[in-house]
Amino acid sequence: MNPSLIRKLEGLIERHEEVQAMLGEPGVASDQDRYRALTREYAQLEDIVHAFQRFRQAEENLEATKLMLEEDDADLREMAQEELPLAKSTLEEQEQALQVMLLPRDPKDDNNCYLEIRAGAGGDEAAIFAGDLFRMYSRYAERQGWRISIVSCNDGEHGGYKEVIAKVDGEHVYGRLKFESGGHRVQRVPETESQGRVHTSACTVAVLPEVPEAEQIEINANDLKIDTFRASGAGGQHVNKTDSAIRITHLPTGLVVECQDERSQHKNRAKAMSVLSARLQAAEDERHRAAEQSTRRNLVGSGDRSERIRTYNYPQGRLSEHRINLTLYRLGEIMEGDLDCIISPMIQEYQADQLASLAENS
């Protein structure tokens, strides 16, 4: 392993001991924000410390195996010759696992996020597919122990959604969902199709990390046009009796955000402002990414409708993830929320790209 990486790891081990000592200080739990930050850092460092211990053990095993090759005993030499390939591959695996842990982390990966799904080409069928996608993500959120709640929606005329925006709260939400942004295409026979012909429809998905209040872009109140209106849809007796729903227009960019999820106008306004802040921050991040002119492919999509990332082919039960040339014939399970079979390979490919970039620059 590169000596500079070893030095970095030794520094992290020292930091692990420092954090452990700080967590043992009397009264540390009285400052909840500091305590949570230290606990989170300790858990991350603990994983690296254990991985480094496994790497050192693999190094020792390889050295011991090489020494056995020099033994006088022919049986020992033969045994060492058999064990050598496994000892080498184990060390390589442990080294790669450590390198992945040392990759620069996106600080937003631990954030909650907003999930936006919009029907595109395909009319009613596109809206129905948007509903299917929302159900898929809702099932996935349940599996992960996350909480998903609708912020605003515009129902389709024959089911599904013309547009739905949801908030997803939980552990590592953005880090796992960020690869979902882009164009999703469906190929299937609509229920209304009497001739049995396969139609193609599309939806766009955008995943935006929630911006913590302390980091939110400053928005000038004079740049906002705020309208109130009566909520529509499910909600019992309260519906359409008060103007609790909020529509905020950001005049410089033309961005419009609506929220009618809460009965309180104040809460709806706070939610809408949070979505607006996330969209403005995402637009700013996208400008920075474009300015970097990176030669590496960007697996994290922008949510642009022209950026087709995935095709769902119902007649063949096939899902095609175009960015990494992944084809899976388990569409039924995926639509029921079994998304890890796509998300995990995407993360691995993303990490491989990062490792390749580090190797080029080292």
Curated annotation (Swiss-Prot):
<dbReference type="InterPro" id="IPR050057">
    <property type="entry name" value="Prokaryotic/Mito_RF"/>
</dbReference>
<dbReference type="InterPro" id="IPR004373">
    <property type="entry name" value="RF-1"/>
</dbReference>
<dbReference type="InterPro" id="IPR045853">
    <property type="entry name" value="Pep_chain_release_fac_I_sf"/>
</dbReference>
<dbReference type="Pfam" id="PF03462">
    <property type="entry name" value="PCRF"/>
</dbReference>
<dbReference type="GO" id="GO:0016149">
    <property type="term" value="F:translation release factor activity, codon specific"/>
</dbReference>
<dbReference type="InterPro" id="IPR000352">
    <property type="entry name" value="Pep_chain_release_fac_I"/>
</dbReference>
<dbReference type="Pfam" id="PF00472">
    <property type="entry name" value="RF-1"/>
</dbReference>
<dbReference type="GO" id="GO:0005737">
    <property type="term" value="C:cytoplasm"/>
</dbReference>
<keyword id="KW-0648">Protein biosynthesis</keyword>
<keyword id="KW-0488">Methylation</keyword>
<protein>
    <recommendedName>
        <fullName>Peptide chain release factor 1</fullName>
    </recommendedName>
</protein>
<comment type="function">
    <text>Peptide chain release factor 1 directs the termination of translation in response to the peptide chain termination codons UAG and UAA.</text>
</comment>
<keyword id="KW-0963">Cytoplasm</keyword>
<comment type="similarity">
    <text>Belongs to the prokaryotic/mitochondrial release factor family.</text>
</comment>
<feature type="modified residue" description="N5-methylglutamine">
    <location>
        <position position="237"/>
    </location>
</feature>
<dbReference type="InterPro" id="IPR005139">
    <property type="entry name" value="PCRF"/>
</dbReference>
